[in-house]
Amino acid sequence: AGTAPADLTVAQLESLKEVCEANLACEHMMDVSGIIAAYTAYYGPIPY
């Protein structure tokens, strides 16, 4: 469930990254697994 990465705009992805980068653990997971996986793991479904 949730939003497929291809459905997100660049601006939406950037805003997710900004939220994730405020959390060191999320930022690390983003580097390993990608922004979609990291954001949903720490913050739940993508709100778009």
Swiss-Prot record:
Residues involved in Ca(2+) 3 binding: E21, E27
The entry's cellular-component GO terms read: extracellular region
Annotated disulfide bonds:
C20-C26
The principal location of this protein is secreted
Q: Which GO terms describe its biological process?
A: biomineral tissue development; bone development; cellular response to insulin stimulus; glucose homeostasis; negative regulation of bone development; osteoblast differentiation; regulation of cellular response to insulin stimulus; response to vitamin K
* Highest taxon of the lineage: Eukaryota
Q: Which UniProt keywords apply?
A: Biomineralization, Calcium, Disulfide bond, Extracellular matrix, Gamma-carboxyglutamic acid, Hormone, Metal-binding, Secreted
Which residues lie in coiled coils? Answer: none
Give a short account of its post-translational modification: Gamma-carboxyglutamate residues are formed by vitamin K dependent carboxylation by GGCX. These residues are essential for the binding of calcium.
What GO molecular function annotations does the UniProt record carry, in alphabetical order?
calcium ion binding; hormone activity; hydroxyapatite binding; structural constituent of bone
Name the positions where Ca(2+) 2 binds: E18, E21
Q: Which residues carry this modification: 4-carboxyglutamate?
A: E14, E18, E21
Location comes to: Secreted; Secreted, Extracellular space, Extracellular matrix
Q: Which PROSITE patterns match?
A: GLA_1, GLA_2
Residue ranges of domain Gla in the record: 1-44
The residues the record assigns to binding Ca(2+) 1 are E14
What this protein is reported to do is described as:
The carboxylated form is one of the main organic components of the bone matrix, which constitutes 1-2% of the total bone protein. The carboxylated form binds strongly to apatite and calcium.
Q: Which family does it belong to?
A: Belongs to the osteocalcin/matrix Gla protein family.
Q: What name has this protein been given in UniProt?
A: Osteocalcin
**What is the protein's species of origin?**
Cyprinus carpio (Common carp)
Gene from which the chain derives: bglap
